[in-house]
Amino acid sequence: PVVTRVQFNSHHDYGWQDGPMIPNKGLQLYASAGVYGRLYKGLVEFQFAPEVVYAQNQDLPAPGVRMYQGDFPDRFGTETYQRSSSGQSYIKLNVDFLSVGFSSANVAWGPGRYSSVIMSENAPGMQHFTVESNKPLKTKWGTLEGQFLTGKMMHSGFRYAVGPTGDGSSLEPVY
């Protein structure tokens, strides 16, 4: 599949649930193209879908103090922002109701008003190892689905108004 997005913010940086796109004043372009396949009667499943982002990243007025702290830079450097990544790519081994694999795709867990409850598509995906159900497992109490993943979330590398900088933190949620 081929996916393109164009976004233009004329006054201030804004963006939410845009994946690898950044909150940006000015023009921003996103493109992704890839291939999906299954081999050996579905035993091996793969998707290669790299992503490219270009943003003008124009200058902004100085921000005020924010209520929430986190890695939310007001501006991603002082130059034009360009980034390419492995995007929504993965490779999995499917056996019965279980899948095991490596992925850089976004993970979204649970419903939410503006984004998923635990994980979302509000940032680029991270590289991770996953063990997950690929279909519901029927039990006498109902059906069960789940996912275990482990990976390392990396700091953006850009300064932001409030909060410390860091080199990453490990992530090992089970849902």
Task: Give the ranges of each region predicted by the language model.
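Transmembrane beta-strands of outer-membrane beta-barrel pores
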Residues: 5, 39-41, 50-56, 95-97, ...
